[in-house]
């Protein structure tokens, strides 16, 4: 039971900026970490729904500014780890270099032109989606559930897809995960969330 609690803490420590108690980064504590990855999405979803409800219904904030706030909530909760990965991947894939060079680009901390373009498109699309959904309570709920579902799919991908490198963070998460348990839990969570939508 202790390793399950430690896996929960490890998931929040790695994938969010939400303060969590200290946890040792060892194989036992990372065993079920991917099972709890969607709970970071739960935190984002609940916060997004609450902010949308309070600022939209009670404060009656101007819709465009509310859409801006809803767009940046995931970045504040996660510290931007998901955006960082997207932008690194965009730079690497858009380089059209050989595999080894693309892997070097993934590790490079500098943002290239394609990363900046991808970031602009990413945030504009999110802003547009939120602006369109404001006033539609069901739409905001569905978007909030989507934060959990996307993390279910990401967790499944970490576990079952081939890794670009054998020594990276994702490879370590996959190697230390209880593969069958994590995959089954994530698939069941995804299915339950899909029904809930």
Named regions from a protein language model:
Residues 106:
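Divalent-cation-assisted or electrostatically stabilized phosphate/pyrophosphate-binding catalytic cores
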Residues 110-113:
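Selective transmembrane-helix segments that form parts of the transport pathway or gating/packing helices
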Residues 1-79, 94, 98-103, 115-197:
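Hydrophobic alpha-helical transmembrane segments
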Residues 80, 84:
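Hydrophobic "anchor" residues on beta-strands that sit immediately upstream
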